[in-house]
Amino acid sequence: MKVMKFGGTSVGSVNSILSVKRIVEAVDEPVIVVVSALGGITDKLINTSRMAAAGDASYENEFREIVYRHVEMIKEVIPAGEAQVALQRQIGELLNELKDIFQGIYLIKDLSQKTSDTIVSYGERLSSIIVAQLTGAEWFDSRKFIKTEKKHSKHVLDTELTNSLVRETFSSLPKRVLVPGFISTDKMTGEVTNLGRGGSDYTAAIIAAALDADSLEIWTDVDGFMTADPRVISRAYTINELSYVEATELCNFGAKVVYPPTIYPVCHKNIPILVKNTFNPEGVGTVIKREVSDPQSKAIKGISSINDTSLITVQGLGMVGVIGVNYRIFKALAKNGISVFLVSQASSENSTSIGVRNADADLACEVLNEEFAKEIEMGEISPIQAEKNLATVAIVGENMKHTPGIAGKLFGTLGRNGINVIACAQGASETNISFVVDSKSLRKSLNVIHDSFFLSEYQLSLIHISEPTRPY
């Protein structure tokens, strides 16, 4: 049995959705198919709800576009007849529900998180019903078995309950199943929640792990993990194999081919992930598994980058030798739901720098200044501020630990090209070296690192995705 996930671009047009039909129907074994909303629909749902909440009557025009996309898609891909009429009626009922919600928001001029989560869930519900009809699959409502619980003001997966419900739901598995991705429900209240941006990948991985699937396939609009963004490096090609660790590191540092939480559930069960292109189904794609076939072939597998980085530094002579400073930093940030993707600390212990997304920078400074208010007042720690408009670059490869000189070559290359490194970090596992530069230096950094490694004895794979445009 396999699980296949198709993203928004894969179901975003008539041609692509018909390609999905051919790919799914070619599978002989039992298959569970997970789909995202039609490409662009989630953004339209969010925009329409915000317009309605602001009292902008033109929200109705946005809503009409949402209706048109789905009605026309059905007309194009489902032959005229009773099946099409029945499907239009079913979709029409959901769209009418959505219309009523938007009207309510417009009247009260308010949009709660609960209502917003409900609205965005319609994208996957609508698309999955259409694809189920198109492929002859049996539709299952993921809200009934993907369960979340609230932690630190965010909804996170209740793994134990979800696994139990997935196994119960699919104890007798039909040959072809269709499931909406991304959406879930709170285990206590039953309210609609979601798994976050990229959550459809996660839905597929959760199901694959719970059912011990033979494989998980992620179908998207690229040929897998590429050696370079062709907008930056023209000699890009597909990376055939990555380890779970390498793929996770690349994804955590900006490569949006696969949603990072997707990897752990299947890694735990040793289920391979195959990333394929819906628009080029014959392509090899990228296989992600525990061990690659030739682990000695490359010291560096890829470079990934995050271009919206803020660096926050907690510093002061009063930190030296004081136990628990870092604990307080990370506890305060975690309590407020702020994720840290880079940590750099001076050996003298008088400063700790953390990398966060620009959107989290102001809140991070606020909570840290509050946490260390006493030390700041006494002059032991300096007032905490964020340095914004930065970028983080990470080179990744499990075999760096076996290859001396990688860090020297990396920073030597940057120095010779006049690129200043603001902060850097390397884990003890030696699977990645990450560093922070001014965002204006990002493109140059990627190019010179590529040239230095690719044209040398070390074969380089490069990934740089600066602004994710993936669907749910």
Mark where each language-model region is.
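Charge-rich, low-aromatic oligomerization/scaffolding segments with amphipathic character
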Residues: D360-I376, S441-Y458
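Nucleotide/pyrophosphate-binding catalytic subdomain
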Residues: M1-Y259, I263, V436-D438, E457
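A glycine- and small/hydrophobic-rich beta-loop-beta segment
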Residues: I263-P265, N270-I273, N277-A386
